[in-house]
A protein has these predicted regions:
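Ligand-binding pockets and gating/stacking loops
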Residues: 1-117
Length: 117
């Protein structure tokens, strides 16, 4: 379904102006513990396409066990990257519908500019 979405957006000429993000909130432990592999927030992946993202580009890697990233991108950095791509001011305080304040990506977050052409 993901590939079909990307292909459809590309064929319609909409991919360059649409950022598609496929992300999870955690990875899986490198070791099997008998019941599965459990949640593992230290090393996981996300996929970005369109919206100026370089095609076929891979950013970062992990050690051979898949336990630790060599160039970690925090969840806040990912949020800042998405916000930057969408043209949002990263320093501005926004408020949710219930009044909760938040900053896109957080105060120390940095967009990963290397992802973009």
């Amino acid at each position: 379904a993901y590939a079909a979405l990307i292909r459809d957006l590309d064929e319609r000429g909409m991919l360059d102006s649409t950022l598609v993000v496929l992300a999870t909130e955690f990875g899986r432990k490198p070791q099997f513990n008998g019941n599965g592999r459990g949640h593992y927030p230290i090393c996981f992946c996300s996929v970005l396409a369109g919206g100026g993202v370089k095609r076929g580009f891979v950013y970062g890697s992990s050690d051979k066990e898949g336990a630790y990233p060599d160039n970690p991108v925090t969840v806040n950095d990912l949020h800042a990257t998405i916000g930057w791509a969408a043209g949002l001011p990263l320093e501005k305080v926004f408020h949710t519908g219930t009044g909760r304040p938040f900053v896109v990506g957080g105060v120390k977050a940095k967009p990963v500019h290397q992802l973009f052409a």
